[in-house]
């Protein structure tokens, strides 16, 4: 796009120019970590955030008892960058190991009916192979992936030698001899990545599994942590440490870059100039920003086609411990509109349930997003009450979040489709002029929050000229 054309998108009148060494777009973990590193090295850094808060896809629901998470649920003891940052800024960490046994106890719901675990091996819908009939459906898939994962290192998913595995989960499972009925049971039910097994790369899931295994191999006695006050406390602490206050409500609409300078235009008319720009926003958001000169080739295809996981979360406070009436666990793994229900245990005693969270992913999130928020909440609660009559009138909805409907994320974690890793995996983080890219979707060796931190570190080193 020519300079005159890019100028045409500037709101009128353009406000006073703001000059920095580096402008970071997005105040999530990756952007704030990059800003922190660069400020430590003496750079003048300005962070722009379109939302009303910092944290990005780390979202603590502070209106709910115990501050449960709608994004960035917990993190392992091997998340070195995240833990070091929390300790640097005196964010207290809470060991979640005591609650893990409670989390592992889930009720299984098939065809709108709770199936006692003792009855699962002989259930007519149990299509697991002989010798595996007792395994919980979702855990069977993880077992199969672990037993067949060829990746010897977490970054090996980007090695061309493994690109033959950049096929759909469905195709790979069929090649292992599994029928459609089994794939629907162990993968498509409460799907964690994508909308179906047909739209997700198996190579990506080998990466996910390799990362989980690498964390386990570290041998820590602690299962994981959350932060006091919610995990959002960590990005908030990073933001508070910055010399320049994070600029909220700054929706970037255009970036132009030259050999040694860049200009950033916001929807409110403000204009920022810097030698370097760091874009930490998801590609689903980045593709709506006008960039001049235009990005072309595989990187442009990545920006336009890499998707993010559809995920909704409903937080509910129980008016009474209804699970004590029916003698079942409050946790449920269902094939109903209730999705996956998790009891949050944020009190001093792990036996105390402070709230319940319904995880609503993939096609279920799609269905709910077509409803009004009130109707979506009502349909989920109605589903829970149908499955658990003891829960009737016992659930108070207190927070609901759709990541796809959030205009600053349009989904949660990145989803690599079949063939996309081979096609443009090596190009997603390539600098474009003075524009650099980070975010969980550009991480190579780590997942989740640590992946975001990895990418923030990498992009800061790019700006510093170290890599």
Task: Mark where each language-model region is.
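Short hydrophobic core segments
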Residues: 25, 48, 252, 271-285
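Glycine-rich FAD pyrophosphate-binding loop
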Residues: 39-62
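Active-site/ligand-binding neighborhood in enzyme catalytic cores
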Residues: 149-251, 258-261, 415-416
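Conserved beta-strand-loop-beta-strand element in the redox core of flavoprotein oxidoreductases
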Residues: 256-271
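Mobile amphipathic helical/loop "lid" adjacent to a hydrophobic cofactor/ligand pocket
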Residues: 87, 94-198
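N-terminal Rossmann-like FAD-binding beta1-loop-alpha1 element of flavoenzymes
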Residues: 20-47
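Conserved flavin/dinucleotide-binding core of flavoenzymes
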Residues: 6-10, 261-263, 310, 325-467
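Flavin (primarily FAD) binding-site architecture
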Residues: 279-297
